[in-house]
């Protein structure tokens, strides 16, 4: 299927590693021009090189999105270089384990900035360009908002906010023809996930026990699979889909 993404300029926050990297590589294969916004230039450039080696195009902007001023600067840099924005994938963040019992005000607020505030700011500053292009927005979110996990209050709250923003923006932006959807992630073996699993007793046994609970194939979702769904939601092939929380999790 041709997703009609050729030459589309798509911002992908946190696009250098993990799920974001998977999304960027799929978009590159589809002929889009993903633009990574991420804090580590070395990681950004490595993913840019991988996309280009596969015959695609890719760009990058270095930004620390926990800084509220960084989102506007990053979006301006994209517009200055490419002249437009056709889509946004909000993906950057991390399950940072700020719980109810072990957390505090400062850590909780810092986690919300790391995991939710820049979702709002990136889209806020991209909106004029998205109006022109009638672009699409995809928010990457986590099952923790719906299931809980324990010991990660801030991350769960941020993902609840991501889900709420998805539906709120879908309503607010209807008049501009801008669609907004979310891809809800459960288990995907990213570098961050690997670091987390290694903190547990008997990590390999724990990993196998987690995989055993996943109904479809008893395996984790791949970053490429998440990228495929994200690309579809950005495409006009999903032209009548908005305000949806799409669970890509093997059941």
Report the location of each language-model feature.
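C-terminal substrate-recognition "lid" of short-chain dehydrogenase/reductases
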Residues: 4, 120, 129, 219-248
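Conserved glycine-rich cofactor-binding loop
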Residues: 16-18, 40
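Substrate-binding pocket helix/loop in short-chain dehydrogenase/reductase
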Residues: 99-112, 210-211
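Active-site helix of classical SDR
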Residues: 123, 158, 166
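Residue(s) in the substrate-gating loop at a strand-loop-helix junction
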Residues: 142
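Short, small/polar-rich loop/turn modules that mediate ligand/substrate recognition or access, typified
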Residues: 174, 179, 241-243
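Catalytic Tyr-x(3-8)-Lys segment
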Residues: 203-225
């Amino acid at each position: 299927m041709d997703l009609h993404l050729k030459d589309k300029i798509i911002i992908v926050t946190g696009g250098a590693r993990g799920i974001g990297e998977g999304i960027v590589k799929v978009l590159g294969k589809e002929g889009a021009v993903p633009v990574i916004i991420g804090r580590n230039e070395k990681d950004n450039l490595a993913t840019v090189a991988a996309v280009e080696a596969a015959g695609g195009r890719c760009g990058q902007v270095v930004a620390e999105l926990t800084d509220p001023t960084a989102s506007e600067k990053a979006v301006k840099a994209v517009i200055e270089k490419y002249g437009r924005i056709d889509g946004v994938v909000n993906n950057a963040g991390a399950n940072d384990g700020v719980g109810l019992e072990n957390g505090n005000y400062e850590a909780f607020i810092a986690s919300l900035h790391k995991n939710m505030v820049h979702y709002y700011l990136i889209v806020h500053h991209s909106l004029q360009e998205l109006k022109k292009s009638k672009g699409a927005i995809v928010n990457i979110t986590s099952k923790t908002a719906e299931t809980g996990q324990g010991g990660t209050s801030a991350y769960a709250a941020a993902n609840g906010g991501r889900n709420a923003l998805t539906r709120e923006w879908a309503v607010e932006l209807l008049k501009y023809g801008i669609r907004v959807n979310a891809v809800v992630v459960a288990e995907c073996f990213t570098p961050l996930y690997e670091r987390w699993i290694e903190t547990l007793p008997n990590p390999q046994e724990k990993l196998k026990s987690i995989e055993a609970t996943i109904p479809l194939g008893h395996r984790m979702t791949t970053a490429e699979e998440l990228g495929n769904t994200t690309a579809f939601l950005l495409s006009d092939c999903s032209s009548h889909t908005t305000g949806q929380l799409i669970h890509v999790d093997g059941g």
